[in-house]
Design a protein with these regions (language model features):
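Catalytic loop of short-chain dehydrogenase/reductase
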Residues: 15-25, 96-184, 193-199
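Solvent-exposed, charged/polar functional surfaces in cytosolic regulatory/catalytic domains
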Residues: 79, 83, 132, 176, ...
Length: 234
């Protein structure tokens, strides 16, 4: 059931790749609640994924941009404001990738070049996004910026590897930039984690059932992944 909670609101959603993506589910729910969207991912992801299907389904515009490149982000926010007809009310950051995990490098034998890429894509891109938005004055007063994090940012999940470091950094950026943006413009910068069930980096993990159950019991959004993900839109 929709309640028009986002009626008239303009948003940018980073990271929708296919219908298994958390960002995809958030986009669907946001549009159900009345939002207008720009969807973005890297040029390669836009070509290889099915984001165009989501755009057609939701009546959204796709703007390809590399979230690790400041010039791409500047282009993205400028074009998004033109397409949507004004400043942005909400942004979802759902960007994460670890080549160390894909290559099965253990945490005590990381490739530091790949670690740099992990941190840049999964965390520092969030700072770049916020900094560009602030310099361009692209967000409305009291806008909301949300990044997806993971329980491994503060719990040891063997196998989550350098992504745990990236999520810790992501949360630190949210606190530090949120303090500045909140005081100056009332912009709310937050992270939210879902119950740890099959976000893309997590599918390689072999963890105990108890580790999967704990966040469901203890965390504020103690609900299944699909419901949880869609709720973040609100």
């Amino acid at each position: 059931m929709a309640y028009n909670l986002l009626k008239g609101k303009r948003g940018i959603i980073f990271g929708a790749l296919n219908d298994q993506s958390i960002a995809w589910k958030v986009a669907e729910r946001a549009v159900e609640e009345g939002a207008q969207l720009v969807l973005t991912n890297t040029p390669v992801a836009c070509r290889m994924g099915t984001i165009s299907q989501l755009a057609e389904q939701t009546g959204s515009t796709v703007i390809a941009a590399d979230a690790t490149k400041v010039e791409d982000l500047e282009m993205l926010f400028s074009e998004a404001m033109q397409v949507l007809g004004g400043k942005i009310d909400f942004v979802l950051h759902s960007c994460a990738m670890s080549a160390n995990m894909r290559k099965k490098r253990p945490y005590d034998d990381l490739d530091y070049g790949l670690l740099d890429k992990t941190l840049d894509i999964s965390a520092i891109s969030f700072h770049k996004m916020l900094q560009v938005a602030k310099k361009l004055d692209a967000l409305n007063d009291f806008a909301s910026v949300l990044a997806l994090t993971y329980v491994a940012s503060h719990r040891t999940f063997f196998g989550y590897n350098d992504m745990a470091d990236a999520k810790s950094l992501l949360e630190s950026i949210a606190r530090s930039f949120g303090y500045i943006y909140g005081r100056e413009k009332g912009v709310r910068v937050n992270t939210i984690l879902s119950r740890p069930l099959t976000p893309q980096p997590a599918v390689v993990l072999k963890v105990l059932t108890a580790c999967l159950t704990l966040p469901t019991v203890c965390h504020p959004l103690a609900m299944p992944m699909r419901t949880n993900a869609q709720t973040t839109a609100l």
